[in-house]
A protein has these predicted regions:
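A boundary/linker detector
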Residues: 1-49, 86-90, 94-128
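Histidine-centered nuclease catalytic patch
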Residues: 38-71, 80-92
Length: 128
């Protein structure tokens, strides 16, 4: 007995529940260090900000805010996701219960708090 093939229906993408990132937030983060990589963790760091990294991942409730974003190069972005424990210690990743606005992050050897205006406030902890 010959079977008739099932008709395939196209997959539909679920609509996003979160609003899209505004260009103002994107430009503020990407220009915060003059277009340079803020993490500078990998030995192959290109130094050029190519990716917008969410410190608190979107899958963990992270939003498109200036305090939650880092401008990083491709190599550093890969390193951050490949080594989450080290990244969390440096502040490049924030847990789902954490607050990126109050969690310090290592930028240029200093632990700083990211401000909504696109600046830094020293957290008082120098990192070697």
């Amino acid at each position: 007995m010959k079977r008739t093939p099932l008709r395939r229906t196209p997959m539909r993408k679920k609509p996003s529940r979160k609003p899209p990132m505004t260009s103002e937030v994107y430009e503020t983060v990407m220009g915060r260090r003059g277009g340079r990589c803020e993490a500078h963790v990998a030995t192959k760091c290109t130094g050029r900000a190519e990716h917008w990294h969410h410190r608190q991942l979107r899958s963990r409730g992270g939003e498109h805010t200036v305090e939650n974003g880092l401008a990083v190069c491709h190599a550093c972005h890969e390193h951050i996701h490949r080594f989450p424990l080290d990244s969390r210690e440096a502040g490049y990743m924030v847990s789902s219960w954490g607050d990126p606005a109050t969690q310090p992050v290592r930028i240029g050897g200093l632990m700083v708090i990211l401000t909504p205006e696109g600046g830094y406030i020293a957290a008082g902890k120098k990192v070697a």
